[in-house]
């Protein structure tokens, strides 16, 4: 198959993916509108957004590109053959990060993205065996979860280890082109003249430093740039995990961990990427909480390290604290939106059914929480998988992004918080319903004391929708994930669309 035919096929697939994503968004908005229409007197009009860059850059609009696919593919194929191909300028916009600072988002035209992806796959196929086994980013044989699992297993072998944590300032934006190009002919990498030409075409938009974000070829370049650093760390006999520019290094030998500091500095100087001293933790002693004394000061010791969205202890893996805050915020909003807000705004439909064992709004709230935590599964399906009554489960939702979290106390605490949050909201809901004359005192659908409320929601005999009222459990889905990992392996049960960025 010639290049033009390949481009037509791949651009078509990319357009179909983006069009489906937009239609899914459209359907989600419509379903939300229908749900709100059932429970609210006043419903906001449906408002569908399109990305601004679809208008300012037609090459990013999948509907336009799909319609003109043959012309676009022919033009690009001809330009590559004649060596005058250059990607169009990307659309660049900013979104706020959690710390309030802006995060730059780069979106290349669809066809240029496809070119980048084709050459990235070709380069990776030929060269992935050259990359360190401790480099986990942007590869089809490794991923973020493998990194976390390997780190946890190795740290668990010792009651204490020295760890080095460093953060680079804008790794993708600062890396020197001179340093990068020197790597093309070093260290056994196979890069053809055509592939080098395509790389140069994408680098030409970046001046004399930086690699293009938002395009696949930069993923190969990021690993290529770090090859010598990886090699030096391996030669020193250090344990490490690198995901793009995020690197965690550990050892039981203090001298070796100090040597890693010099290696990081040397790489920073050679590649012209400054170290972010404010965000870099430097060298610390990682130890069990019960080990009170050490040769390090209290500031130089820690019981866990945060890496790629997880918090890793010597004997367990947890959610990071900021993730716990995010989880609670999301669930609290679902509860408030469904159970409290309509009553406070006097926007509650009187004929919404509230009878013994039935409260439509409560059912919707619990179903949405369940979908958030573990997708469209119900508790019985998960129990059947754990006990072996069913052989396969499609894991979705929050926990499928964090399959390695095994901090039982943290998960039990989340379960307790969820029950308490529901209980408080239901008590307030019953009070508001009584005050607004929707129901009479003592006639709410479920018991208002916590113990009986939980039993009633989780059993709810006689209600054909009883599965929809069952309270979801972080511990329950954790047990199912453990079974899945043992039975099928980590790569089979994790989300295929696990984010590659923003850890």
Where is each model-derived feature located?
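Conserved two-metal-ion catalytic palm core of "right-hand" nucleic acid polymerases
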Residues: 1-183, 189-191, 203-205, 414-503
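Short secondary-structure boundary segments
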Residues: 60, 111-139, 208-224, 230, ...
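Right-hand nucleic-acid polymerase module
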Residues: 117, 231, 258, 287-503
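Conserved phosphate/pyrophosphate-binding and hydrolysis machinery centered on Walker-type P-loop NTPases
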Residues: 66, 141, 215, 219, ...
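Short His-Asn-centered micro-motif
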Residues: 108, 250-251, 308
